[in-house]
Regions:
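Bacterial N-terminal signal peptides that target proteins for export
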Residues: 1-12
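N-terminal signal peptide c-region/cleavage motif recognized by signal peptidases
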Residues: 17-19
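Short, glycine-/small- and polar/acidic-enriched structural segments
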Residues: 23-147, 152-155, 171-174, 191-192, ...
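Extracytoplasmic/secreted envelope proteins and their assembly/folding machinery
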Residues: 35-41, 63, 67, 78-81, ...
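Soluble non-cytosolic domains of exported or imported proteins
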Residues: 57-60, 75, 127, 131-132, ...
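Pocket-lining segment of extracytoplasmic ligand-binding domains
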Residues: 79, 153-154, 159-246
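Secondary-structure end/capping motifs
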Residues: 214-289
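Conserved C-terminal helix/tail region of periplasmic/extracytoplasmic solute-binding proteins
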Residues: 285-309
Length: 309
């Protein structure tokens, strides 16, 4: 009875407005996607604590910042979370989203002779180590019955990969939106493989153990705002694209494509999500990206997911 009463009080507290806090929540973002959604949806109004934003070009440096405690929370994909967790990062996934994984793709120049995944044999593929692009390359090769030794993976950050593809230093680039949409629209590339059928489409907000303990109320409030903004963005791609274009300098038409095709939406962290994440980790083990089998269950914290609107 006492435990039930305590759970009731916690549930009630989660619905109450957060009192003004002196805390600063340090938030990691990629290409300002989360910030763009929050600004466009009005979710950054009347925030009763400070938010300090840190922008990253990819998930790998964001994961490193989480591991170092330089940020409290940040958004990253399923594979980067595994990569960071396997490296010993004291972080937990505290909320989840799912998108249509057509927003992950291996792209090649229009004039390339590469037409499908099988044609990647013997080719050079650029990607960012530990990213969802890295995962896509590994999963696509396995699906096509190719080994990692059948290709040359060149690890680099997105800006360098984009240049390498344009100059012909690599044959293909395994990446994610907005980079996929940007290269399709501005560099005349096409997709030879995407994440449909090989990727869960899951992404997460991950927080440090310290932030979960010391900034619990601020973190819970922030995650509720993110989920509300993501739901709003589903039916307002033009507004989100316009705001994010002003923030990032990326073309609004490209960003509209990103939001329309991803259909990113919040999902609860449940046993099914954890099982999908385990399969992703097991693929990384088979590909020798991580060296020992990883039990992903401890990398999740369900308490915030259960209070999301």
């Amino acid at each position: 009875m006492r435990r039930a009463y305590v759970r009731f009080l916690v549930a009630i507290a989660a619905t109450l407005p957060l009192a003004v806090s002196a805390a600063t929540l340090k938030v990691g973002d990629q290409q300002l996607q989360t910030r763009g959604i929050l600004e466009a949806s009005g979710q950054l109004k009347d925030v009763p604590y400070q938010i300090e934003w840190f922008n990253f070009p990819a998930a790998q440096p964001l994961g490193e910042a989480l591991n170092a405690g330089a940020i409290d929370v940040g958004g990253l994909g399923d594979a980067p979370l595994i990569f960071a967790y396997s490296a010993g990062a004291k972080i937990r996934a505290v909320s989840a989203t799912r998108s249509t994984p057509v927003d992950l793709a291996i792209v090649v120049p229009d004039a390339s002779p590469i037409r499908n995944a099988a044609d990647l044999k013997g080719k050079r593929i650029a990607t960012t180590r530990g990213s969802i692009g890295h995962y896509l390359a590994v999963a696509t090769l396995e699906h096509a019955n190719l080994k990692l030794t059948d290709v040359t993976l060149s690890y680099m950050q997105p800006v360098d990969a984009q240049a390498a593809l344009a100059t012909g230093s690599v044959d293909a680039w395994s990446t994610w939106d907005p980079y996929v949409a940007l290269t399709e629209a501005r560099q005349h590339t096409r997709s030879v493989a995407n994440g449909v059928g090989v990727s869960s489409g899951l992404s997460f907000e991950a927080a440090t153990d310290t932030a979960i303990r010391d900034k619990h109320a601020e973190l819970a409030d922030f995650l509720r705002r993110v989920a509300a903004g993501q739901r709003w963005a589903l039916s307002h791609p033009d507004e989100v694209a316009a705001i994010q274009s002003r923030v990032t300098g990326l073309p609004a038409d490209v960003l509209k494509t990103v939001y329309q095709r991803a259909q990113l939406h919040p999902v609860p962290i449940d046993n099914g999500v954890i099982a999908e994440q385990q399969r992703t980790a097991d693929l990384y083990l088979r590909a020798d990206v991580i060296k020992t089998r990883l039990d992903v269950a401890p990398s999740f914290d369900k308490q915030f997911s259960s209070t999301a609107p």
